Amino acid sequence: MRTANAAAGRTMRYSWIAVGLLWLAGVGLRLTILAVPPVILLIQTDLSLSGTEVGILSGLPVILFGIAALPGSLLVARFGALATLVAGLLIAGVVSGLRGAVLNVAVLYAATIVMSAGIAIMQPSLPPLVRAWMPHRISFGSALYSNGLLVAETLAVLLTIPFVLPLVGDSWRWSLAVWGLPLVAICCAAVFAACPVSRLPRRPF
């Protein structure tokens, strides 16, 4: 009986870890993308961007979401959903920070393309993870990462100007680096917390 209770406790604990990981993965889908609009005027002034160049910068992520979705699905099939999620988070988080080191618009475009591709390959990994971790609560699992996505859109826009920019001396470069850090942290959480979650049988909450 004691062994059964301990196993049930572990299963419940890891179920809640799965809840947190799915929500955080949703946060990672938008956080670095929506960090740009609040500082776009600073970027435009610093790099002397034209209106057309600003438009291209804003549109690149959307284009990459479409282009890289299929390769993302192939990566999930080849390496697994968790490995693809971790790779996407790491790419997006690191390259988001590197955007602050760019010296011209061409390099900024290149960094934005790589970062957006990292996010795009993450998206096909989430439905398989929901099915693996929450087979009895697929709708709930899907709602989790969707909610994380929406919260991330709000956080980046809401906090950048009043909080993040003052902390980094009104530097758009450091602001983008700051917003890349959560993705690296989520990546680490996925690496260390998801393995035991994946090994345990799932059951309804």
Task: Give the residues covered by each predicted segment.
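Residue-level signature of mid-helix packing/kink "hotspots" within the transmembrane helices
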Residues: 34, 62-70, 154
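A generic transmembrane-helix signature of 12-TM secondary carrier transporters
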Residues: 89, 93-96, 111-112, 180-187
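Cytoplasmic helix-loop-helix junction between adjacent transmembrane helices
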Residues: 111-148
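Conserved MFS/SLC helix-loop-helix module at the cytosolic interface between two early adjacent transmembrane helices
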Residues: 67-106
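Extracytoplasmic
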Residues: 17-51, 69-72
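Small-residue-rich segments within alpha-helical transmembrane domains of MFS-like 12-TM solute carriers
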Residues: 30, 34, 116-124, 154
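Helical-face signature of the major facilitator-like transporter fold
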Residues: 22-26, 30, 96, 104-116
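Helix-loop-helix hairpin linking two adjacent transmembrane segments in secondary transporters
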Residues: 104-107, 136-198
